[in-house]
Amino acid sequence: MSLLTEVETPTRNGWECRCSDSSDPLVIAASIIGILHLILWILDRLFFKCIYRRIKYGLKRGPSTEGVPESMREEYRQEQQSAVDVDDSHFVNIELE
């Protein structure tokens, strides 16, 4: 006899738990924690690049450019953009001789 037939059996209304302790507060808390863990894991996998960049570089966009000439600001923006573009690439070309 399998574990599935001992614990849960399909009925016409859906899956029914045959455990007598299913109303135990510990079981309910464990179920809620499990569901929250699953939701957080899914969100982490969906937004990991955004989340970890935010942690790594902080909430600021970069160092302050107050008092810096506009030409240097533009050069800095281009450098930062090229660094982000390189970081987003998923493949590296390796040429063998």
Swiss-Prot record:
Lipid-modified residues, S-palmitoyl cysteine kind: 50
Residues in compartment: Virion surface: 1-22
GO cellular component: host cell plasma membrane; membrane; virion membrane
Main location: virion
Keywords: Disulfide bond, Host cell membrane, Host membrane, Host-virus interaction, Hydrogen ion transport, Inhibition of host autophagy by virus, Ion channel, Ion transport, Lipoprotein, Membrane, Palmitate, Phosphoprotein, Signal-anchor, Transmembrane, Transmembrane helix, Transport, Viral ion channel, Virion
GO biological process, one term: protein complex oligomerization
Residues on Intravirion side: 44-97
Positions of transmembrane segments: 23-43
Topology in membrane: Single-pass type III membrane protein
InterPro entries, A to Z: Flu_M2
Entry keyword Flavoprotein: no
Region (Disordered) residue spans: 60-84
Highest taxon listed in the record's lineage: Viruses
GO molecular function: monoatomic ion channel activity; proton transmembrane transporter activity
Record's function text: Forms a proton-selective ion channel that is necessary for the efficient release of the viral genome during virus entry. After attaching to the cell surface, the virion enters the cell by endocytosis. Acidification of the endosome triggers M2 ion channel activity.
Family, per entry: Belongs to the influenza viruses matrix protein M2 family.
Record comment regarding domains: Cytoplasmic tail plays an important role in virion assembly and morphogenesis.
More info: When the channel is activated, one or more imidazole moieties of His-37 probably become bi-protonated.
Official protein name in the record: Matrix protein 2
Native source species: Influenza A virus (strain A/Duck/Germany/1949 H10N7)
